[in-house]
């Protein structure tokens, strides 16, 4: 029996501004990516995961009389949908940790590790430590390898070294893409529809 993760979204109900595109920024996109990474890492357990809602309200697409806006979390779905393989490969992150505050679940009253990126680095109770980098690895029968890498730090870029245990030197990076903005709260709006978007990134350099 597998788990069906129904009607998930990264935000609780926003009573003031639920339909405002400015309410859904890059921080929303980062958390969306981390949740999708969690589903991939637990693909042997999670058989179904339904994002709700996808259009309007707090969804990835908002429709207006003059057209539609793909909000900041939309390119995350687009990127992973087109760059995730059929097979999951275990990966491990060794490095820096972030201290982030946690919140009590509004229904159960039990602690839940809701990640507040803007509050990282400020130790408050309750809090938890998380890896500053999130990684998932997938691939296909033809040998293609896909790495999904998320920097959780709200203010700083991070460098990382990728080590492939069983095939050092066997891979070369063909394509690299990123979803990035200098402002953690940058949002896609009708006036600025591509503020948070998929862009070609510098390919990692290969070391001997």
Place the predicted regions along the sequence by residue.
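Intrinsic structural disorder
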Residues: 1, 68, 98-99, 171, ...
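Aromatic/acidic polysaccharide-binding cleft in carbohydrate-active enzymes
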Residues: 3-133, 141-144
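C-terminal beta-sandwich/jelly-roll accessory domains of carbohydrate-active enzymes
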Residues: 104-130, 142, 150-208
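Acidic, carboxylate-rich catalytic segments that either coordinate divalent cations
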Residues: 137
